[in-house]
């Protein structure tokens, strides 16, 4: 938002340097991005009166103009297409100075294509007044030739960024009000002096609010016999300094009042409004409407429109229509000032992809009790710059009352929160400076009436924030109030999540955070995630189709992470995410906390002596087994449940004490192809509540062995359909304390073996921690285990 200092000074007396004003506003919560001084990029530039124009004899695109400075006539060669007889424009005579790319240069006599030129006719951009460069400046015909241009355009412009809660500051008056509160300088409001005459407005126009929920107040005036044309210089200068383009005197007045008082207005051509009736209604589904920017919009029945007796003439709070636009032919106008619900305006603006200065202000909230004063201010200015007859009275339909909110604010609470010792009088002064009426209860509380333009103040803590702003954050003592933290212990699941997080970070994994919302595109990529279609939870009012479904797994979001990074040439992607998944179980909506682990890329950094190896199933399995060991889970079981998400032979589901905790594996190649990803993706997902339930955290620390152990190998043939985990489980069920460990040494598959069989070699390590183990004892124990396992798999195992 651009705020000209000269305009600001019309409402508050400020004898401060721009840097001081910027600091005051910043400390009050308005973010001043900076300020610039305009009109100082030139000197000696004056108003020139173009007396004659003829074509250049030696150049098709050049003109020869005779320009008066009020005393003498100068011949100037100009290339602007809008140079014409009778135009008042910016004239830099010989000796004037301009600045180009930071360097000053003086205007000198010269020749262009053989014709002498004594000066330069300037655009606003060349004078660094604005960025408009569509021709030389067109000044008011009422200006005297020879008038110094810097008296009209020199100014300081503040660039202010407003947060959404500061809608009441989105105007010149709003910023002046903040400065008044911070400096105690009195605020002057705009004058309202005009004359009503002519017919009673009820004889010229009727008003009907059908959509009462979306529009709770609508006011309008009729002004007849206006003369639409160019705006006077003072009006045009203020509009352009504030970053808007001058259109005509009627439109410029509505923009002027928007900038000045912060409330959007709109003017309709009265003679183009059918039935002389204004109807505030919802659009019809599929209704087509051409907005002022020349684009046709397809409306929905959730869009609020202003209509006449036949058709829409404006999208309420967003933009007017071509079919009622004020033009040079307009002689009678309807001037609108209304209060539209911020939610309706925001939805309409987003759905149509159409954001305007008006919609931004309506979305932040405007003051419904300001409508009449805003309307009258605009009517007064229109009468001043365009003439016309303001018809008697105002059409004003209101569907509800807008009362000031009364909030109890305790003095003790103010000092407790801020760590201050403010007196009652100091707080009263602050409330008065803010324009808040109040009553003191004689003990500790103020009953504060909040003006309706302060939509951001809703409860006591908001009033305390206002006190802090005006008192000054830099005046609040650093040793503020002391507070005791909650004595309630953290939730066990939260502590468990933190433990998992710390371990996985220590493993060298990055933490990812993805969105809970996904779209059909990702769902189609992943297809079946062990979750039926009826379990998917859809969002009723999604902001976009790609955020219309709550995720049933962390995989879709993490696949997006892989795709994005590979597209940006980042091939090493190892990380995890702790988040929530959502699904529907019958009529109940369920939410679960899960951890997802993802590996993609190479297991070791590049080395010239070693061949690069991609992450595989066993890399992921190793991380998971280490995590389980960290959690004290000693006997995990892995089963292949043939989940469609994973490669059929490179997956496993994790069971602990018959409880399925999660699954992991290599993401199915078909998913990789749909993502257009060439490198392997490993993924695992585990239910945190289930993991916490089976975690014991009772780590058994074994001392280093002081007695030697003994090893035995066993090679046997077994069906490939028997999971290795089942064999290990059978051994552990029969083992004694002498068996320290069992390792898989080798798996051999060959056409020479019986179809569907493989050779497997296991190494058994025996040790007695109290003495040297006898070989006879080892042999007996080894034979016992071999016999037990052989009997267990009698139909599947051959020795």
Curated annotation (Swiss-Prot):
Mg(2+) binds at residues 456, 462, 465-466. InterPro entries: aa-tRNA-synth_II/BPL/LPL, B3/B4_tRNA-bd, DNA-bd_dom_put_sf, Fdx_antiC-bd, Fdx_antiC-bd_sf, NA-bd_OB-fold, Phe-tRNA-ligase_IIc_bsu, Phe-tRNA-ligase_IIc_bsu_bact. The keyword Lipid metabolism does not apply. Pfam families: B3_4 (PF03483), B5 (PF03484), FDX-ACB (PF03147), tRNA_bind (PF01588), tRNA_synthFbeta (PF17759). GO terms for molecular function: ATP binding; magnesium ion binding; phenylalanine-tRNA ligase activity; tRNA binding. Its cofactor is Mg(2+). It catalyses: tRNA(Phe) + L-phenylalanine + ATP = L-phenylalanyl-tRNA(Phe) + AMP + diphosphate + H(+). Keywords: Aminoacyl-tRNA synthetase, ATP-binding, Cytoplasm, Ligase, Magnesium, Metal-binding, Nucleotide-binding, Protein biosynthesis, RNA-binding, tRNA-binding. One of its GO terms (cellular component) is phenylalanine-tRNA ligase complex. Residues 402-478 form the B5 domain. Residues 39-150 form the tRNA-binding domain. It is found in: Cytoplasm. GO terms for biological process: phenylalanyl-tRNA aminoacylation. Its EC number is 6.1.1.20. Tetramer of two alpha and two beta subunits. Belongs to the phenylalanyl-tRNA synthetase beta subunit family. Type 1 subfamily. This is Phenylalanine--tRNA ligase beta subunit. It comes from Protochlamydia amoebophila (strain UWE25).
């Amino acid at each position: 938002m651009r705020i000209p200092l000269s305009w600001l000074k019309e409402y508050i007396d400020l004898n401060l340097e721009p840097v001081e004003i910027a600091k005051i506003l910043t400390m009050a919560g308005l973010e001043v991005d900076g300020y610039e001084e305009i009109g100082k990029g030139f000197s000696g530039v004056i108003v020139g009166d173009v007396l004659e124009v003829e074509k250049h004899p030696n150049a098709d695109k050049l003109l020869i103009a005779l320009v008066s400075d009020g005393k003498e006539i100068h011949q100037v060669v100009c290339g602007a297409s809008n140079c014409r007889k009778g135009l008042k424009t910016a004239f830099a005579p010989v000796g004037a100075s301009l600045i180009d790319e930071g360097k000053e240069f003086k205007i000198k006599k010269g020749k262009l294509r053989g014709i002498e030129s004594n000066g330069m006719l300037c655009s606003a951009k060349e004078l660094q007044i604005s960025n408009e460069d569509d021709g030389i400046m067109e000044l008011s015909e009422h200006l005297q030739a020879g008038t110094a241009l810097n008296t009209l355009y020199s100014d300081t412009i503040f660039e202010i960024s407003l947060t959404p809660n500061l809608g009441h500051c989105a105007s010149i008056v709003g910023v002046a009000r903040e400065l008044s509160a911070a400096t105690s300088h009195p605020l002057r409001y705009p004058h309202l002096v005009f004359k009503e005459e002519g017919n009673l407005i009820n004889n010229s126009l009727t008003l009907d609010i059908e959509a009462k929920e979306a529009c709770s107040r609508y006011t309008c005036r009729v002004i007849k016999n206006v003369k639409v044309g160019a705006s006077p210089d003072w009006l045009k200068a203020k509009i352009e300094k504030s970053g808007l383009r001058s259109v005509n005197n009627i439109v410029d007045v509505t923009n002027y009042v928007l900038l000045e008082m912060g409330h959007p207005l709109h003017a309709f051509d009265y003679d183009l409004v059918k039935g002389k009736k204004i109807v505030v209604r919802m659009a019809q589904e599929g209704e087509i409407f051409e907005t002022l920017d020349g684009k046709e919009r397809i409306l929905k029945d959730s869009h609020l429109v202003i209509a006449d007796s036949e058709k829409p003439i404006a999208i309420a709070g967003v933009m007017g229509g071509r079919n009622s636009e004020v033009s040079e032919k307009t002689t009678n106008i309807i001037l609108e000032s209304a209060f539209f619900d911020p939610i309706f305006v925001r939805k309409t603006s987003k759905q149509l992809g159409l954001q305007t200065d008006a919609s931004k202000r309506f979305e932040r909230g405007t003051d419904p009790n300001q409508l009449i004063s805003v309307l009258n201010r605009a009517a007064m200015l229109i009468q001043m710059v365009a003439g016309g007859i303001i018809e008697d009275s105002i059409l004003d339909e209101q569907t509800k009352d807008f009362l000031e909110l009364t909030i109890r604010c305790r003095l003790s609470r103010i000092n407790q929160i801020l760590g201050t010792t403010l007196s009652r009088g100091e707080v009263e002064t602050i409330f008065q400076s803010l324009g808040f009426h109040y009553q003191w209860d004689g003990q500790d509380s103020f009953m504060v009436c909040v003006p309706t333009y302060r939509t951001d103040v809703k409860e006591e803590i908001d009033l305390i924030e206002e006190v802090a702003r005006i008192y000054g954050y830099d005046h609040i003592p650093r040793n503020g109030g002391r507070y005791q933290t909650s004595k309630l212990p953290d939730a066990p699941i939260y502590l468990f999540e933190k433990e998992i997080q710390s371990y996985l970070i220590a493993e060298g994994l990055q933490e990812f955070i993805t969105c809970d919302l996904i779209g059909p595109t990702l769902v189609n990529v992943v297809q079946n995630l062990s979750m039926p279609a009826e379990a998917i939870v859809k969002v009723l009012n999604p902001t976009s189709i790609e955020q219309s479904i709550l995720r049933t797994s962390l995989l879709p979001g993490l696949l997006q992470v892989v795709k994005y990074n590979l597209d940006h040439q980042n091939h090493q992607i190892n990380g995890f995410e702790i988040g929530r998944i959502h699904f529907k179980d019958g009529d109940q909506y369920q939410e679960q906390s899960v951890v997802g682990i993802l590996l993609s890329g190479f297991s070791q950094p590049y080395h010239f002596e070693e061949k690069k190896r991609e992450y595989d199933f066993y890399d992921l399995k190793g991380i998971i087994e280490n995590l389980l060991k960290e959690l004290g889970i000693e006997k995990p079981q892995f089963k292949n449940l043939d989940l469609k998400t994973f490669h059929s032979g490179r997956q496993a589901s994790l069971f602990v004490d018959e409880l399925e905790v999660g699954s992991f594996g290599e993401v199915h190649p078909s998913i990789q192809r749909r993502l257009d990803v060439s490198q392997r993706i490993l993924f695992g997902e585990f239910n945190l509540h289930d993991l916490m339930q089976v975690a014991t955290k009772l780590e058994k620390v074994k001392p280093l062995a002081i007695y030697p152990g003994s090893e035995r190998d066993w090679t046997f043939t077994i069906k490939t359909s028997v999971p290795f985990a089942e064999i290990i489980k059978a051994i552990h069920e029969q083992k004694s304390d002498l068996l320290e460990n069992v390792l898989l040494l080798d798996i051999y598959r060959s056409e020479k073996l019986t179809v569907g069989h493989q050779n497997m070699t296991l190494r058994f390590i025996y040790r007695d921690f109290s003495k040297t183990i006898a070989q006879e004892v080892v042999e007996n124990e080894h034979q016992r285990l071999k016999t037990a396992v052989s009997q267990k798999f009698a139909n599947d195992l051959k020795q």
